[in-house]
Design a protein with these regions (language model features):
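C-terminal ends and interior cores of transmembrane alpha-helices
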Residues: 83-100, 289-301
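Central cavity-lining transmembrane alpha-helices of secondary-active solute carriers
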Residues: 49-67, 257-269
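Cytoplasmic helix-loop-helix junction between adjacent transmembrane helices
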Residues: 109-145
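Primarily marks hydrophobic transmembrane alpha-helices of the MFS/SLC 12-helix fold
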Residues: 75-78, 283
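Helix-loop-helix hairpin linking two adjacent transmembrane segments in secondary transporters
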Residues: 134-135, 139-196
Length: 402
């Protein structure tokens, strides 16, 4: 009798949980910025540093992952990633209120869960790309939509929890969020792992990737996508409160929550209708919208218009990250873990640099986040130029992946 074929649906579902874990890691702590400033005396520059530590740690893991993940194996590495995320969230909830220097405790917790976040980012995309699927670009976009739904859930649940139990209850909430990576550990423990590089395809080394101009273009696109996405997302809550003058509950729900909703909608649309859409055309039109919304958020004096611009920025950046992954996998099928790791490095660089630049520019201009976002519009402008170059030199009219 022939062996039963592995059921990779469980694997893909576990990857969805992995991206929800990543969303909790990246989006829970920024909701506490105003609380940290008021109760712990942490200024905007040091708050900006917290974001940077998170994404730079993930960046370092991304760099190293290409060297050790294939050697150790995907299953032990993805489980270890969720264990680190679990430990970091528990540390965030338990340590800051129990030590003399809460800022150092927060930094330590961020470092722990960022180790897990970096591994998750590197691994879930190639796992889903390797799982059998008729339209891989659609599957990739759907995977990344779960980051958005995770972000939306993180913001909405956290906001309602803090409203119901008070902002002082945030340590309890941090411990409750640790349930998500615990679920991921259980799911990946029983999930089969696919072959990452297609059978019969040679695995590309760094020397092979470095000889391909398309790799550098994809790297720059990922850099800009991360900066444009997180430059708005990480500061949306604080921008709504301080820049637009709305309450914290309204600011969190209409700022980062609406951003996540629209980003998830964009990715889900392509995840469902991707076989009917041209990927590069979708990215190009989204880039134009991104530029317009950054400028609107920075220049408007109307709170409603500013919140709308923030939300539509989420829609505009939604396809950038998964779309670039799909384009790269199509152009370099032998890229494997190394290619995804290097592209994740570019994305992490953008995620770290984007909000840091916005925060530093704001700090240098009287803590004006409007000025920071105005400067941040350059991320979307550069991204638009990359998309135009990609359409001309890389894929042109791209067919759906099979």
């Amino acid at each position: 009798m022939s062996a039963t074929a592995p059921n990779y649906n469980h694997t893909v579902t576990a990857c969805f949980v992995g991206y929800i874990t990543q969303a909790v890691i990246n989006n829970f702590m920024p909701l506490l910025f105003v609380t940290f400033a008021a109760t712990l005396g942490i200024d905007m520059a040091r708050l900006s540093a917290l974001i940077t530590v998170n994404f730079v740690t993930q960046l370092v893991v991304d760099v190293l992952a290409g060297k050790f993940v294939d050697r150790i194996g995907y299953k032990p590495c993805i489980i270890a990633a969720h264990l680190a995320a679990l430990a970091g969230l528990l540390a965030l909830g338990l340590l800051p209120t129990r030590v003399p220097d809460p800022y150092l405790a927060i930094l330590a917790a961020i470092f722990l869960y960022a180790l897990g976040g970096g591994l998750i980012e590197v691994m879930v995309s190639p796992i889903v790309e390797a799982c059998p699927s008729e339209h891989k670009a659609k599957a990739m976009s759907l995977l990344h939509s779960f980051y958005c739904w995770g972000q939306l859930g993180t913001v909405a649940i956290s906001t309602l929890f803090l409203f119901a139990f008070g902002t002082g209850s945030w340590p309890v909430l941090a411990c409750l969020w640790a349930i998500v990576p615990a679920i991921g550990i259980a799911m990946f423990a029983g999930a089969p792992m696919p072959r990452i590089v297609p059978e019969g395809t040679a695995t590309m080394r760094f020397a092979d990737l470095s000889k391909k101009p398309v790799f550098y273009l994809m790297f720059l696109m990922m850099l800009c996508a991360g900066a444009a996405e997180q430059g708005m997302s990480q500061w949306a809550s604080a921008f709504a409160e301080s820049g637009l003058g709305v309450t914290k509950v309204i600011g969190d729900l209409a700022g980062p929550a609406a951003f996540a909703l629209m980003m998830g909608l964009s990715r889900t649309i392509y995840g469902v209708l991707g076989h009917r859409l041209n990927l590069t055309a979708f990215i190009a039109s989204s880039s134009v919208l991104c530029v317009a919304m950054y400028l609107t958020a920075a220049l408007t004096t109307a709170p409603v218009l500013g919140l709308l611009a923030c939300a539509l920025t989420g829609f505009s950046v939604g396809i950038m990250w998964p779309g670039t992954f799909s384009m790269a996998a199509d152009a370099m099928p032998g890229g494997g873990t190394l290619m995804f790791a290097l592209l994740a490095v570019a994305g992490a660089l953008g995620c770290a640099g984007g909000p840091a630049v916005v925060g530093l520019v704001a700090s240098a201009n009287g803590d004006s986040l409007k000025t920071g976002l105005l400067f941040g519009s350059m991320f979307a402008l550069v991204l638009l130029a990359c998309v135009v170059a990609a359409r001309k030199t890389v894929v042109g009219e791209r067919e759906p992946l099979h």
